[in-house]
Amino acid sequence: MKGYRTARAVGWIFRFVFTLLVFAVVGLVIWRIFLSAKIPKSVRYLQPNEVLSAAYEANDGNLTFRRQEQTSITRGEKNNGYFSVVDCVFIPEAEQVQIVFRYNNSTIRHLAADYGLEKIPEKSETLFDVTLLRTTDLTPDDTSDNGDPSTLSSERIYPTSANRAESSLYTFYRFVFDGVRIEDDTDGVFADVYYLGALDYSDVPYGALCLYASGDKWLSRPLSAGDKKVLEG
């Protein structure tokens, strides 16, 4: 009887220790993912340039910072989860847009498979071209035909600057785009992603995310203490 109780106690201790280890491992994985997903400090805050600084000074620091609630991660059949925009701000007084663009390490593996590359590119390589596509409604009095490409014109806007940062699981870029005007006939603004090794703007982008859609509600984008610090510089 004594041996039975001892064996039972040992079994209980073993199960307890095993369960504890499982929870510890799961907790460590979740914590690692959380830390990796957090925007690194070097790209977390607004990136002032001459355009933004001039607008900030001209308006006595009273700038509008806004965004829209749009899908922040690609959900297409061929790019599901590949790319995301984890921060976006429109600053109309400066005619500027800033975004934080992010992709996972697994996206690089998918890239190699999708484009038939001989080997998986190094994480440190610059792999993607990111631009904005601004579409304008040529028939603003009739929005029912906006699904017809012939009723829209488009303008591609290239980044003024790009700052890069990495975590263990992700690669981040803060892109600054100047000359982005949202007017009454602006139909949409999209972040287009192309693989640099096969860059052709006439092709469908590898990934695309809507940043602005005509008629959708604007939301205030609060400034963090870090944003205010760099603006007041």
Where are these regions (language model features)?
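N-terminal Lys/Arg-rich, disordered targeting/topogenic segments
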Residues: 1-12
